[in-house]
Amino acid sequence: MLVTGATAGIGQETAKLFARRGASVVITGRDTQRGAQTVAAIEVEGGRAEFIAADLNDIKSVRRLAEQAGDVDVLINNAATLTAAPTLEQDVESFDIMFDVDVRAPFFLTAALLPKMIARGSGAIVNISSMGASVGVPFAPATAAAKAALESFTRSWAAAFGANGIRVNTVAPGPTRTDSAIDTFGDAFEQLGAQTLLGRTAHPIEIAEAIVFLASPQASYLTGATVAVDGGFTAV
């Protein structure tokens, strides 16, 4: 199984949880040091993991990753950039990087890995979006749009490949206590947590539990769905 963007935050917690449940995990990221540290953390708990360095902003790197990962039965499209810029302040360069990493990379990585899933007659894909895909986000509209694209991929891929035994779902987290989220959103991050029905932010492991469930046999009749793990933020 393959988890992209797994050297920190939600991706890292997801990889660790899969390993605790007995999976052999391939993790990706740009930082080789953090990759090695994540592998070591998994192995010290008795798990199995391999790190593949990949820059998902580079389509050639995406294709190399697919080749190196080999036969993948579970794919977690988690890697993302995180920027907070309102419309009048959004620059073209960071916009392009965001859509390359958040939209183009998961599309073509999934396309490269699907043939072996189809041949095997089974597979599970979980895309990680955001509650921002479902609500207006005035301080980060481009980020919200990129996440909405992932949710659209989920529905289209579920429709296209369900007959091949492949399930595709999305987890849409709410405000989650990762270093990148706290650094990017600052005071607004805590305010978002306070606005959820549960009145708090999430811990990465809480999001990871939902991801692992959707990839597991326990979710065998679940496909094409977006599961909001956002403390009820989008419920009202």
Model-based region annotation:
Residues 110, 146, 154:
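Active-site helix of classical SDR
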Residues 115, 159-163, 220:
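Alpha-helical segment proximal to the catalytic Tyr-Lys
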Residues 130:
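Residue(s) in the substrate-gating loop at a strand-loop-helix junction
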Residues 107, 114, 200-235:
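C-terminal substrate-recognition "lid" of short-chain dehydrogenase/reductases
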Residues 86-87, 91-99, 181, 192:
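Substrate-binding pocket helix/loop in short-chain dehydrogenase/reductase
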Residues 7-9, 31:
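Conserved glycine-rich cofactor-binding loop
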